[in-house]
Amino acid sequence: MRAQYVSDHIEGLDEPLLENPRTQIFHESPKKIVNKVDSPDLGMAYSMNPYQGCEHGCIYCYARNTHEYYGFSAGLDFESKIVVKKNAPRILEQQLLSTNWNASPIMLSGNTDCYQPQERKFQITRQILHVLAHYRHPVGVITKNSLITRDIDILQDLASDKLVQVMISITTLNEDLRRIMEPRTASSIKRLKTIEELAKANIPVGIMNAPIIPGLNHQEIPQVLKAAADHGACTAGMTIVRLNGSTGQLFQDWLSKNFPDRFDKIWNQICSLHGGRVNDSLFGRRMRGEGKIAEAIDQLYRISKKKYFAGREMPPYDLTKFRKGGNLSLF
């Protein structure tokens, strides 16, 4: 990777930091920004990552392992060495202008949160949305940051043609748990207010209650879904925790430090979801788990979704609006 050291501080965070790692910014100029998603577990065929690494610092994040491809660690480096892809909007436009490209929803993002704190400064996600709106191309956004409300103007424009679906991730309503598990993220109250603001702006928005960790947050499923529905969410999703690669050891250390009295129970329950391991790459099972605990969690989720989201749904995309080939370049 061709990278350049730029800055060594954190700015623009929604919440106070429990720790203060000195953030380093690296620039990368990729030749490709739209990635084909081969996983049948995910609802979209393509994803796009304006950044690599994430200052949010969620201990369970499956994307931590991808930072090792850059020669960084999956631990503190993932949270404090952020790769910025400044040319992403231009590369995206080149992709959309290709005669071989056919409209298909692109997810922001796959291995990062596109509204993490550095987005305040670099505004790459906003530029990407501007490109997508110009070419009337469908996009999905998943985030746990209230910064998304900054871009309501573009999201409204996309929503007017059924070109956007937003999912706000809420793992817990317990702020004590949120602060140690997702230390540099927006509070659950801010995320619920974000859902409300987007819904009032007629932007289709749902709740992603993920990941579900038995013994930590599984019992909150009904409360989380109800709160999201009360604030205007039109649908809900859920995934089970999976701890692949280095993430497993990081989570194990975190769990033993913060919940020593419950460590064995929680760890063993996570293992029971994935055939006796915390590492699971099997399509289908990895996102839902298996066994009695997984079945109980799934039943609780389905009952809660039926109760609080009856008659609601995420509107489908309209792929016919895509301006194939475009006219004049934005750049």
Show the residue positions of the predicted features.
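Auxiliary Fe-S-binding modules of radical SAM enzymes
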Residues: 1-29, 35-36, 219-331
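Short hydrophobic alpha-helical runs that function as membrane-insertion/retention elements
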Residues: 140, 206, 236-238
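Conserved Radical SAM active-site core
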Residues: 16-52, 56-167, 171-179, 187-200
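Glycine-enriched alpha-helix->loop->beta-strand junction motifs that scaffold or abut catalytic
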Residues: 160-163, 204, 231-234
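Conserved strand-turn element in the central/C-terminal portion of the radical SAM core barrel
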Residues: 173-175, 181-184, 197-217, 240-243, ...
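A structural motif corresponding to the C-terminal end of an alpha-helix
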Residues: 131-137, 194-205, 273-276, 300-311
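Active-site glycine- and acidic-residue-rich loops that bind
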Residues: 146-149, 213-222
